[in-house]
């Protein structure tokens, strides 16, 4: 992934490919794009979308919502049954670490 597969584009080097396996899904993050796949079938469920879309609830001018600076980390907390996704924001101001946690094990639009 990261070489045009499933709509991922490689726009930086290295591609900073990162992923995690959850209860029913696999989350793949390649630099600035994130996608969700079915763990059982491998089918694309959502995305790829720009990683900063995960942080739009912070407001249109918040650096985490505006910047999509990459170096993502996708993790699944098996004990809590939640996804934890991070990326940094360093463009145009002080650095931020953008962190988003899911409300349950099923990653989909709106449940982060």
Residue locations for each model-derived region?
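C-terminal PAP-associated
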Residues: 1-112
């Amino acid at each position: 992934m990261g070489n045009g597969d499933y709509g991922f584009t490689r726009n930086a080097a290295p591609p900073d490919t990162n992923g995690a396996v959850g209860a029913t899904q696999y989350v793949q993050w390649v630099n600035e794009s994130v996608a969700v796949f079915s763990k059982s079938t491998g089918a694309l469920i959502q995305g790829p979308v720009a990683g900063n879309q995960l942080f739009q609830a912070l407001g249109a001018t918040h650096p985490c919502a505006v910047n999509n600076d990459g170096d993502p980390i996708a993790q699944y907390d098996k004990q809590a049954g939640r996804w934890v996704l991070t990326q940094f924001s360093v463009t145009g101001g002080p650095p931020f670490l953008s962190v988003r946690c899911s409300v349950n094990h099923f990653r989909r639009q709106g449940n982060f």
